[in-house]
From Swiss-Prot:
It comes from Pseudomonas putida (strain ATCC 47054 / DSM 6125 / CFBP 8728 / NCIMB 11950 / KT2440). This is Ribosomal RNA large subunit methyltransferase K/L. Signal peptide: none annotated. The gene is rlmL. It comes from the Bacteria. Keywords: Cytoplasm, Methyltransferase, RNA-binding, rRNA processing, S-adenosyl-L-methionine, Transferase.
């Protein structure tokens, strides 16, 4: 075999230039960058050194051969031509990895099979010995990459991916791979800061990946020093003496690094379940003297190095996945920015994020940004210098005259990030509405009401108050609106709401309203199960702001519920499409002789049962799980007061066909009116904006539209929110 080899090093997308720089420093020559990889030339000692020292590579591949191919036979022949006896014993084990497609190879499994067959056929001897496949821990791992008709055949010297350092056996919900964490640290300038004796703190450290990688860089510890099994361990071309030399050098450097006074490296994590796993990872890495992890919230983050040294604050905030997370993430970033401005003056900061637009909400100008990929997710690394001249809040200070004490230049109180002009206008509108509607709500003893409903077209939101919580619904923007501008306006609004209303950011819940299909509007969106009790007209009701698109209480129907409460005394009440039966609770409060509530959803009937029980109402209030149309066709009871508030559109596995309120309302009302007792009243309402009541109904029944009477002041701005009718028998 030659003394010089072509090496191919793979890495996460976006790390190519960093890896090229690192590999050059470790001795790789003739370096060229490719997508998610680099290549170059090196001797065996450099190959070993890259394996043990690369903080950024996934794999180190030793290229055996490059050859062109047009079909599967060319693939077989090219692999078979290699003298495999130089690499693998006849009775050894191998694994084959194949990537790419073309030249008649459209299936990677088929390609890997052809490579394996060529190797096995080459090594099969007269005694019948032949290599076998071992996917987990083979003697050699062969890799073939097919790229535009060229096959690149390699041996994987690394074995398992080099990002698997061996210390992180316990991880959190959204782990950052170790080599990506190392790349972020390098881009953030940690090697320079560490060389100067600086500190490092992570306010959301999870299980400590940034902390361990930072300590290994600072202590000059090779990231894969503790790896026991390599891709070259059983390779026949392995040179043990050369490997021992490289490994011993790395061992000596690690011992020297650990003998130095440790730097101040600290992590803080709010989730108590991650504290011990993080500490276990630190101990496995042998860095217990260098790294400490404590439980702590971002809101109380305040690094205090023992010698008052400055350094780097680094963080990978969580990514929002659930309904409503966008609001909580916005406030998390704002909180992080506030803590940096208040407690980390003079430090540098690095935020690795999948939501870079939220970085603008931190109140500090980012002086440099780098693009990365976390798997398939595009991310940005935002770098900050925590200095007053970089602040974009009310905290920016005028230049101090010479001789002024340094402490006077440090902000002593955290102020919110400065609102944009548009956000300030939005905040002013909220405060104006609050002043007007708040008086009415207090007078009527109403806990929950709509404060804002797209009053300003550019801020297409509905903002509802539920006691001291805010429920925000974003209306889907038309396709003609630039999504980036719509997103920026949403973030402006979310920043303004806590300031305008004087509430905690943690009490703002965001949801996105768009055209719903089928039962999607009733699907569970999260699993927090957080119910809270609210009051309406002397009735206690349960709402859930987080788990579903709707909250369990349709605020626009408040006047209708109050009307039902006033009219229900001594009557038999029927509530069709009852949802969480809030109207039923009002009827019971008003003295109804009996109530019957029908809905197809078990979830909402369980909720209805809780609403009734919360008010002390017994089983005489019947709850029926059924398709409303089917139930009406089979029911023969009479009712004095009926309320129907159907969805615009509905389907379910439990019902036959699809309900369409425009198409089916005549049949629905005829069935319901057949159950109405003489002198009784049926109230019919729906929220379909294009709805037209069939004129034939007016010939059969006494019909009166009462839409204007069913709107309270909080919905007066949107008189098309619903339409309502009062029907009686002729």
């Amino acid at each position: 075999m030659s003394d010089r080899f072509e090496l191919y090093l793979t890495c996460p997308k976006g790390l190519e230039s960093l890896l090229a720089e690192e590999a050059k420093g470790l001795g790789l020559d003739e370096v060229r960058e490719h997508t998610s990889a680099i290549r170059g030339a090196a001797d065996m000692e450099t190959a070993y050194r890259l394996c043990v020292w690369s903080r950024l590579a996934n794999r180190v591949l030793l290229v055996l051969k490059r050859f062109s191919m047009k079909n599967a036979d060319d693939l077989y022949d090219g692999v078979h031509a290699v003298d495999w006896a130089d690499h693998l014993a006849a009775d050894g084990t191998l694994a084959v990895e194949f990537s790419g497609h073309g030249s008649g190879i459209d299936n990677t499994h088929f390609g890997a099979l052809k490579v394996k067959d060529a190797i096995v056929d080459k090594l099969r001897n007269r005694e019948g010995l032949r290599p076998s496949v071992e996917k987990i821990d083979p003697d050699v791992r062969v890799h073939l990459r097919l790229d535009r008709g060229e096959a690149i055949l390699s041996l994987d010297l690394s074995g398992h991916s080099l990002h698997q350092r061996g210390y992180r056996l316990q991880q959190g919900a959204a782990p950052l791979k170790e080599n990506l964490a190392a790349a972020v640290l390098i881009r953030a300038g940690w090697p320079r800061i560490a060389a100067e004796g600086g500190a490092l703190a992570d306010p959301m450290c999870g299980v400590g990946t940034f902390l361990v990688e930072a300590a290994m860089i600072a202590a000059d510890i090779a990231p894969n020093l503790k790896r026991e099994r390599w891709g070259f361990s059983a390779w026949l071309g392995h040179v043990p003496a050369l490997w021992r030399k490289v490994h011993d050098e790395a061992q000596a450097r690690a011992q020297a690094g650990l003998a130095k006074p440790p730097l101040w490296i600290r992590g803080y994590e709010a989730d108590p379940r991650l504290i011990q796993p993080g500490r276990n990872n630190v101990e496995r890495a042998g860095l217990g003297d260098w790294v400490k992890i404590y439980q702590g919230e971002v809101s109380t983050f305040e690094p205090r190095p023992d010698q008052n040294q400055k350094g780097l604050v680094i963080s990978n905030p969580p990514y929002g996945e659930r309904l409503g997370d966008e609001a909580s993430l916005l406030y998390l970033y704002q909180n992080l920015g506030e803590r940096l401005r208040q407690a980390c003056m003079g430090w540098e900061a690095a935020v690795f994020t999948g939501a870079p637009q939220l970085g603008k909400r931190m109140g500090i100008r980012s002086h440099k940004q780098y693009a990365f990929w976390n798997g398939a997710l595009p991310c940005k690394l935002l770098l900050f210098k925590v200095q007053p001249d970089q602040f974009v809040t009310g905290e920016r200070r005028e230049a101090q005259p010479e001789g002024t004490e340094a402490r006077q230049q440090v902000p002593q109180a955290s102020e919110p990030a400065r609102l944009s002009e548009g956000a300030q206008m939005f905040a002013n509108r909220l405060q104006k509405n609050l002043k007007q509607l708040g008086k009415w709500a207090r007078r009527e003893q109403i806990d929950c009401y709509r404060l804002y409903d797209a009053d300003m077209p550019e801020y297409a939101l509905a903002v509802d108050l539920y006691q001291d919580w805010v429920h925000v619904q974003e209306y889907a923007a038309p396709r003609s609106v630039d999504p980036d501008k719509a997103q920026a306006r949403l973030l402006d609004a979310l920043a303004a709401i806590p300031q305008a209303l004087g509430i905690s950011p943690q009490r703002v819940v965001l949801k996105r309203r768009e055209r719903q299909s089928g039962t999607r509007q009733y699907e569970r969106q999260a699993t927090e199960g957080r119910f809270q009790e609210v009051n309406e007209g002397g009735v206690k009701l349960l709402v859930n702001l987080t788990d579903y698109l709707d909250t369990g209480l349709f605020l626009d129907h408040r006047p209708m519920r109050m009307r039902i409460q006033r009219e229900a005394a001594g009557k038999r009440f029927l509530n069709l499409f009852c949802y969480t039966a809030t109207a039923t609770v009002h009827a019971a409060k008003g003295g109804a002789r009996s109530t019957t509530s029908v809905d197809l959803s078990k979830t909402y009937l369980d909720w209805a049962r809780r609403n009734l029980a919360l008010n002390g109402y017994s089983e005489r209030n019947r709850l029926e799980q059924s398709d409303v149309m089917t139930w009406l066709e089979g029911n023969r009871d009479s009712y004095d007061l009926i309320f129907i508030d159907p969805p615009t559109f509905s389907n379910s596995k439990r019902m036959e066909g699809v309900f369409d309120v425009q198409r089916d309302h005549v049949q629905l009302l005829d069935l319901a009116m057949a159950r109405l007792a003489p002198g009784g009243v049926l109230y019919f309402s729906n929220n379909f904006r294009k709805f037209q009541l069939d004129e034939h109904l007016m010939a059969r029944y006494v019909v009166e539209e009462i839409s204007a009477q069913t709107l309270d002041p909080d919905f007066a701005r949107n008189n098309r929110i619903h339409r309502a009718w009062r029907l009686q028998l002729r």
